[in-house]
């Protein structure tokens, strides 16, 4: 019609020689209206294009593309799509059973597929228990015993090639037919965990998919390849779950470790991604950087499996590398934790497309290629393991026997750990030990060990003569000298130090000093069945780990609450007396209180297991009376965490996690670019994590005025540099050049460069600080020394101003882990915590991370004190 109209117009108004040009124009217009641009590369391939061609596939098993409506790699699979397909496979295949092992913080299912030949299904539980019995006894298993594989994918959500490869692998195991599949499944068991980190995977899938057009863009500058804050690497609270295998701060890790100990697999795979310009890495890593408690035979078997990965990539002409860059030292990551249990943990690292396609020095890297490579090494793992099956079976039994011999021949009989004055921290540690299948006994008589007294029923003894000898040795290590000083992650994770609990090594010659009994029970806090309504006031100590949570619940309910600056002794309604330390919380009944105060207080205290005392009078036998000005009101805080581009998502996430899950405090997270606008919203506390801050001059001025008008500004680690540069915090930080000057570079070769760099770092080590327990930032602490976790070589110049440096590193501060002696000397006796009063407000600086990975319970309360007890600093 359009062409006809144009032809008509041409006849009437244009000369005949012009008509062809008009008609051509009409044709072009008509074509553009009806055009359907076809993408040259949609990305992705049908599932069988990823899989071996010498295998046939059962046509009754649905393919991923038939269920999801797209080829694998065409889009980034979301977790809901992934789980849907796994359920479809389980419904259609008699090889697969599916179990929901837990849920993430965002309520996504954690799935585990158990895959084996149908003939094994009736006997699957007896096969599992026989394997566990052999692991417990160390008896050599028969040659026909099954291998158990735990195939795990994408613990970092923005490293998605693993979980997308799991689609193809699951199909292969469900639908594949022939000798290769029979050899794998007839007498072996595959546990498939398709997504270690569902929340992060879904976050990144949304990012990558929302930026994909019909034409794939390989430009590394495009927004698809420049992920926003926070990244999909982390879980809901922005934690790196590949550091949580030991720490178990999150439900994803707790569920996974439960299944690990239920099955004790022979091989566990851990699929990752790395920089786009890299190639492909598979273990073993740097041999000299493996954990020394891991047997050398583990590396030998890993090398044997590596030969099969290499053979597969050689056949495809793919680039790869091994035995460099990555280590196997930290016990809390996916390729190392299994090694300490007689399993073979294997790390795989694929160069990342970080989207659907990206340019690299090796040419365009398509998402489908990254998926294909992860499938290749998944299959080569099966091939290599079956070829080395007798050696792998023998290794696990030898591991058990060797572990028993190490415990028997060593000088240490065990470790003793005391409760201190805080049952909350102590019980949290006990829960962690139980989840790792570590056995302990209750100390039944007062025991003197290592110049410390451990009280009966308030301490545990952990004998090393048990299956978890290697893990126990690792988590209580105080090693400070290492063969290789380069660490991919931290160099210490001492559990007793993390929980700030007294502990001691028990040498075999001192075992008689530790008395335990099978019927001994740990002392529990004495909790009132009901509190008397006639009390003058109620009070509870600030010592317990969960005291801030009880306080916050009361503030949320509108309870009028006060905190005591000084210790006092009070008369109780039961005619007894009780001493309350500084920071104790007092609830006077004479003030306006909610009608349900009594039931609220009783319910919350019992839930948190915190003793609450009923006071008979406001007149105290010693110390401040209840109406004293030194017992100050605490108002409900309104806390802002500064986040956004440039700020450490890990540290912000750790603080958010602490406030949200352990205190019950609803903190706001505001991007630094929007901080200026937020300052008028009534925040009482603003917290800066490590980061690169670029606040405007107007925002900085407004923030400083906010402090001077009564606000509390808190910073940690590198945020202190920013505070110092703006003269908010009275602190002088040692220049990086001065730190570098401490290290002699004369006669060093180019090959020494990496080792020198490693010496200048603090490789996640434990440092001891001397603390002022009369200072509000340390209310609730009873010992004058505290183990702090240090991951930075930032040093505050030593200075002394009364009352403003309540924590300093000791003269010999290194307790565990690696730090070069030059750094240790620089850090010794320097401030660890600094405060500066500014007008009506205060600025607080922590040189270390008080919330490290949700594990360092011992320093957590410093942050709560900065929130709830900071009124005493103004």
Model-identified regions with their sequence ranges:
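Short, solvent-exposed turn/loop segments enriched in Gly/Ser/Thr/Pro and often Arg
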Residues: 194-198, 208, 271-279, 719
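Intrinsic-disorder/low-complexity accessory segments
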Residues: 36-160, 164-188, 237, 243, ...
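Sec-dependent N-terminal signal peptides
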Residues: 11-25
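N-terminal signal peptide c-region/cleavage motif recognized by signal peptidases
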Residues: 26-30
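Proline-aspartate-enriched helix->loop->beta-strand connector
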Residues: 260-274
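Carboxylate/His-rich catalytic cores and anion/metal-binding grooves
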Residues: 170, 187-210
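N-terminal secretory signal peptides that target proteins for export/translocation
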Residues: 1-15
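Boundary at the C-terminal end of the N-terminal hydrophobic targeting segment
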Residues: 31-35
């Amino acid at each position: 019609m359009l062409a006809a109209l144009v032809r008509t117009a041409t006849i009437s108004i244009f000369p005949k020689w012009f008509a062809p040009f008009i008609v051509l124009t009409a044709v072009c217009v008509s074509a553009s209206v009806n055009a359907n641009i076809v993408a040259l590369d949609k990305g992705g391939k049908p599932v069988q294009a990823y899989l071996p061609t010498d295998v046939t596939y059962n046509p009754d098993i649905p393919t991923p593309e038939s269920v999801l409506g797209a080829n694998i790699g065409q889009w980034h699979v979301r977790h809901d799509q992934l789980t849907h397909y796994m359920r479809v496979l389980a419904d259609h295949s008699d090889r697969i059973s599916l179990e929901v092992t837990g849920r993430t913080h965002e309520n996504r299912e954690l799935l585990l597929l158990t895959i084996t030949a149908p003939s094994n299904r009736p006997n699957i539980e007896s096969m599992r228990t026989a394997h566990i019995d052999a692991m417990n006894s160390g008896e050599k298993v028969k040659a026909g015993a099954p291998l158990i594989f735990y195939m795990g994918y994408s613990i970092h959500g923005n490293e998605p090639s693993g979980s997308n490869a799991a689609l193809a692998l699951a199909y292969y195991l469900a639908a594949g037919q022939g000798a290769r599949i029979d050899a794998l499944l007839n007498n072996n068991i595959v546990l498939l965990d398709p997504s270690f980190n569902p929340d992060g995977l879904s976050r990144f899938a949304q990012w990558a998919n929302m930026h994909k057009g019909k034409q794939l863009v390989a430009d590394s500058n495009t927004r698809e390849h420049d992920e926003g804050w926070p990244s999909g690497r982390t879980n809901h609270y922005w934690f790196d779950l590949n550091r949580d295998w030991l720490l178990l701060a999150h439900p994803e890790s707790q569920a996974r470790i439960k299944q690990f100990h239920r099955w004790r697999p022979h091989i566990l795979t851990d699929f990752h991604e790395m920089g786009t310009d890299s190639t492909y890495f598979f273990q073993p890593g740097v041999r000299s950087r493996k954990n020394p408690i891991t047997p050398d035979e583990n590396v030998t078997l890993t090398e044997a499996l590596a030969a099969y990965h290499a053979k597969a990539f050689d056949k495809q002409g793919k680039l790869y590398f091994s035995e460099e860059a990555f280590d196997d030292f930290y016990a809390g990551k996916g390729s190392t934790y299994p090694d300490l249990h007689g399993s073979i943990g294997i790390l795989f690292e694929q160069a990342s497309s970080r989207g659907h396609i990206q340019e690299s020095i090796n040419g365009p890297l398509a998402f489908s290629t990254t998926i294909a490579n992860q499938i290749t090494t998944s299959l080569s793992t099966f091939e290599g393991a079956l070829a080395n099956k007798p050696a792998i079976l023998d290794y696990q039994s030898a591991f058990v026997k060797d572990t028993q011999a190490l415990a028997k021949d060593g000088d240490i009989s065990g470790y003793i750990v005391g409760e201190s004055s805080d049952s909350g921290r102590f019980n949290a540690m006990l829960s962690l030990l139980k989840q790792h299948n570590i056995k302990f006994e209750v100390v039944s008589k007062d025991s003197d060990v290592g110049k410390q007294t451990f009280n009966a029923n308030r301490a545990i003894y952990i004998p090393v003569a048990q299956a978890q000898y290697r893990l126990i040795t690792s988590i209580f290590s105080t090693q400070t000298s290492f063969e290789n000083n380069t660490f991919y992650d931290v160099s210490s994770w001492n559990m007793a130090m993390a929980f700030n609990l007294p502990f001691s090594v028990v040498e075999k010659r001192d075992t008689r000093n530790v008395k335990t009994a099978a019927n001994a029970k740990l002392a529990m806090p004495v909790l009132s069945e009901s509190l008397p309504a006639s009390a003058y006031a109620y009070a509870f100590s600030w010592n317990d780990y969960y005291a801030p949570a009880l306080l916050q619940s009361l503030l949320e309910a509108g309870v009028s609450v006060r905190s005591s600056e000084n210790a006092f002794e009070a008369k109780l309604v039961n005619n007894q007396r009780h001493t309350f330390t500084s920071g104790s919380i007092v609830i006077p009944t004479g003030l306006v209180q909610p009608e349900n105060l009594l039931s609220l207080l009783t319910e919350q205290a019992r839930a948190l297991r915190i003793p609450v005392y009923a006071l008979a009078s406001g007149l105290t036998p010693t110390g401040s009376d209840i109406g004293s000005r030194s017992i100050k009101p605490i108002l409900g805080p309104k806390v802002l965490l500064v986040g956004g581009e440039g700020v450490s998502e890990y540290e912000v996430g750790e603080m958010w996690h602490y406030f949200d899950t352990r205190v019950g405090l609803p903190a706001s997270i505001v991007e630094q670019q929007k901080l200026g606008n937020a300052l008028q919203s009534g925040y009482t506390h603003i917290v800066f994590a490590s980061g690169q801050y670029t606040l405007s001059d107007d925002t900085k001025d407004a923030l400083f005025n906010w402090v001077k008008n009564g606000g509390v500004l808190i910073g940690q680690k590198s945020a202190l540099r920013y505070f110092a540069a703006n003269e908010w915090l009275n602190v002088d930080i040692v220049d990086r050049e001065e730190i570098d000057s401490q290290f002699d570079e004369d006669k060093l070769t180019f090959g020494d460069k990496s080792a020198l760099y490693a010496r200048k770092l603090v490789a996640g080590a434990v440092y001891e600080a001397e603390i002022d327990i009369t200072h509000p930032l340390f209310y609730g602490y009873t010992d004058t020394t505290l183990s702090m976790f240090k991951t930075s070589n930032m040093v505050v110049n030593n200075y002394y101003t009364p009352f403003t440096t309540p924590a300093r590193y000791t003269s010999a501060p290194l307790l565990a882990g690696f730090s070069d002696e030059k750094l240790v000397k620089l850090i010794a006796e320097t401030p660890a915590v600094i405060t500066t009063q500014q007008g009506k407000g205060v600025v607080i600086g922590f040189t270390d991370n008080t919330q490290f990975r949700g594990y360092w319970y011992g320093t957590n309360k410093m942050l709560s004190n900065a929130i709830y007890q900071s009124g005493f600093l103004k």
